[in-house]
Every structure is written in structure tokens, then in C-alpha cells.
């Protein structure tokens, strides 16, 4: 978030999910707006924990948050529901990733896990791919995990957001991330 939030609210330490939930209950929080996505998927899941104590949460339950947390899960979901997506293979090792790339550039490499927005690399050449593969498999920059080697697609990338309550949904405005 923005530093300006300090003028509106007091930052609290959120060391772990149980501590955060206890704080929300003791301070009679009546709505939780999930920001940091890792809280949605680790442990019980923020939205799940909020539901357990009766606090509405603007954010997906742990099971649905896997769409953001796991590139492999998201890819399987897209394929299962016939949503157009690039072809991809999942590599568990550096050697396997190099084999799947097969000298074809550009290629897209995606770490299968949360990586604070840094887990995707569009590689135009072997040197760029090798550098990212080193970060993933040798340096373990993002922790343990697998990697998607994905077909490079051209055109604008658009994110579609929606809100779901029970069996009702609302599609929000599309958004683009200009990185």
C-alpha cells in the first residue's frame, strides 16, 4: 500500500494469521479487505479464517486464491474450462526447463508460486532465460518450486476481475499492468 495510509490507520504487526485474526476480533473489525495475497493462501487462508470468526472478507477463500498463488493450478483451470491460453509445460529441474525451452525464443518462464510480482520473465534469448533459470533453480530466489515454460503470445495482456457472493457475481472493469 501507500505510505499515505498512515494518516488514516495505524499499522499493526501481522506476524502470523492467528495473531491477525485475534487482533481483528478484539478490535471488533467488521470488514477485512485482503491486500497481501500470501495471507490468502498460507495456513488456513485469511478469508477462511475471517469466515470462521464471522468477519466478512473482501478476498477469495484459500481454494480460490490458488488461481493467483499457483501458475500451474491456474493453467490447469484455464485448460479445463476451455479458456484460451498459451501452451505450457511444467519443469521441476533446470535441465528439464532448458529441454522444454528447446532453443525457442522468445519464451515465457513463470515460477509456480507467490513471488511478489517478480516470478515471470519474458526471455528474448538464451542468456535471459539462463539468468532467470539460475534465480529459480540455483539461487532459489522464490523458494522451492516448479517452473512453467510457456509459449510467448503477442498482444495486450488484460486482467479480468470479478466479485462473487454466494451464487451471484459481478465482472469488474478489466485492467492492464504496464511493467
List PLM regions with ranges.
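Conserved ATP-binding module of the ATP-grasp superfamily
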Residues: 84-86, 107-108, 123-159
Amino acid at each position: 500500500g501507500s505510505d499515505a495510509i498512515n494518516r488514516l490507520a495505524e499499522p499493526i504487526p501481522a506476524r502470523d494469521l492467528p495473531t491477525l485474526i485475534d487482533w481483528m476480533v478484539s478490535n471488533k473489525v467488521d470488514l477485512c479487505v485482503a491486500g497481501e495475497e500470501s495471507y490468502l493462501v498460507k495456513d488456513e487462508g485469511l478469508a477462511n479464517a475471517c469466515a470462521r470468526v464471522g468477519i466478512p472478507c473482501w478476498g477469495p477463500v484459500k481454494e480460490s486464491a490458488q488461481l493467483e498463488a499457483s501458475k500451474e493450478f491456474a493453467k490447469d483451470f484455464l485448460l479445463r474450462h476451455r479458456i484460451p491460453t498459451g501452451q505450457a509445460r511444467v519443469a521441476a529441474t533446470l535441465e528439464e526447463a532448458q529441454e522444454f525451452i528447446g532453443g525457442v525464443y522468445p519464451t515465457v518462464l513463470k515460477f509456480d508460486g507467490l513471488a511478489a510480482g517478480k516470478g515471470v520473465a519474458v526471455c528474448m534469448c538464451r542468456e535471459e532465460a539462463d539468468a532467470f533459470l539460475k534465480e529459480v533453480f540455483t539461487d532459489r530466489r522464490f523458494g522451492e518450486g516448479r517452473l512453467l515454460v510457456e509459449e510467448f503470445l503477442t498482444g495486450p495482456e488484460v486482467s479480468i476481475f470479478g466479485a462473487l457472493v454466494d451464487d451471484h457475481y459481478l465482472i469488474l472493469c478489466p485492467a492492464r499492468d504496464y511493467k
